[in-house]
Amino acid sequence: IYNPSDVEADLSQYSLQIKAYGKNHTAVNPPNDKVLIPLSGKLAPKASIICRHTKAELYTASGLTGELIYNGNDPIALIKGETVIDFLGNDPAKAWLTAEGKAAGEDVFLHRKVTIDAPSQTFVLDQWDATALTKDKQKETLTALITEHFGKR
């Protein structure tokens, strides 16, 4: 999450909403298939923070933690109250897949391009870069990408 403003953001006003899809790319337990994760803390102006699962093993540095259950085909929205502020993934009416039918967010490091400095209420693929995380070098690649891309705005 990036705070593009010149004032500190109160993250307790926000939450992450994940539309949950299973391995077979069908909605999990509709209509209760949206997971809402409340955020907390403050985010300084022009600062970024990484959200990770409480039990994450590859990335364990500080950041927001929670029960982020994400298998790569789930659209994620940053919500303030009832309003979508930012969106990652395709239309939440279907799983987020590549043209080959693979989960689009699986085993990749997704980050918004540094030239994009505003959120989008709809997913715009051209605003994002994805770098594959191969199983044999996931930790090293992830550490290098985080160092390279976060705090560079």
Q: For each predicted feature, which ranges?
A:
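Conserved beta-structured recognition patch
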Residues: 65-144
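Asparagine-centered strand-capping/turn motif at beta-strand->loop junctions
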Residues: 1-5
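Solvent-exposed loop/turn segments at secondary-structure junctions
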Residues: 6, 23, 55-58, 117
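Primarily marks secretory-pathway-exposed extracellular/lumenal segments that are disulfide-
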Residues: 142-153
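Structured segments of extracytoplasmic/periplasmic soluble domains
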Residues: 19, 52, 113-116
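Secretome/extracellular-domain signature
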Residues: 26, 31-96
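Short acidic, flexible loop segments centered on an aromatic residue
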Residues: 6-26
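Acidic Ser/Thr/Pro-rich low-complexity disordered segments
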Residues: 22-34, 120-126
